[in-house]
């Protein structure tokens, strides 16, 4: 599913955020840090990952390089190899304390929400290239609303399923 208007985007973002936080509130610190999935990721690692991608959207909307928002080298980002990008994000946050990850997750989402709030439907339908005209890529890219939705609502829902299954199976 996707959205096509700000009137659809804002409640979808809120619902996905609240649902993910309800799931997180059920977990102990030990569950968030010690339990690992098949790839070795903990709940904390999933949250650091979500934070990095949400921050990349924040940077995108500000016209700043997304690789800087992700915290990965430009060449890694430009490779478009999501596994390599995600591995770089993981390595960057592996030793970060849970409290810091949670604080950054909440702060990044609040900053992103504050940046999206004043945007109009016209702003949200401007293509990727409007926000990052110098980033290489084919054509104009997707509309901003798709970038925002994909890296918040869709991404939160995707990782919430993984987090829930990780905790249930342990």
Label each region the model flagged:
Residues 10, 21, 44-47, 51, ...:
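Non-transmembrane alpha-helical segments in soluble domains
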Residues 3-29, 52-62, 150-157:
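Alpha-helical bundle segments that constitute or directly flank the non-heme di-iron/ferroxidase center
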Residues 18-44, 63-68, 115-138:
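Helix-loop segments that flank and shape redox-cofactor active sites
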Residues 149-170:
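A hydrophobic membrane-anchoring alpha-helix module
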Residues 135-152:
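Individual transmembrane alpha-helices with interfacial aromatic-anchor signatures
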Residues 40-42, 88-90, 143:
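Short, glycine/alanine-rich amphipathic alpha-helical segment
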Residues 1-8, 56-107, 170:
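Short, helix-capping/interhelical loops that line the mouth of catalytic, cofactor-
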